[in-house]
Amino acid sequence: MASTAKATLTFDRHMPSEVPRIALVDTFEDEVRESVAVAKAMQGKLQGVRLDTPSERGRVTADLVKEVRAWLDLEGFKDVKIVASGGLDPERIRYFIDEGAPVDIFAVGSYISDARPIDFTADLHEIER
């Protein structure tokens, strides 16, 4: 695929309509340009854009989220949600909230999957009434 818009349109053609259309928008171009391009290409069927910028490129910041939201709104895509992901933990989520970043969904992965195990037992006991 040569663009995120083309990839998202292909996904849209082949997936059942009940599957949400959320596009990862930091692959080929700037996140803002890709977000607007995909929203335009999807003609009202895009539910969200996912920002997952790697740390080598500055990672997802509150300013980036605000800029994406401003451009989506300016272009008439106020209903498109913004998903933030990429190394999120409680501190990073608090940062976005404190900065007033308009994140609709926080996608948390490795913080949960890499969590320290909690040792416990689950015993069954019969209790007479």
Where are these regions (language model features)?
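Buried, small/hydrophobic-residue-enriched core segments of structured protein domains
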Residues: M1-E75, P90-R92
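Gly/Ser/Thr/Ala-enriched C-terminal appendages of enzymes
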Residues: R59-V80, S85-R129
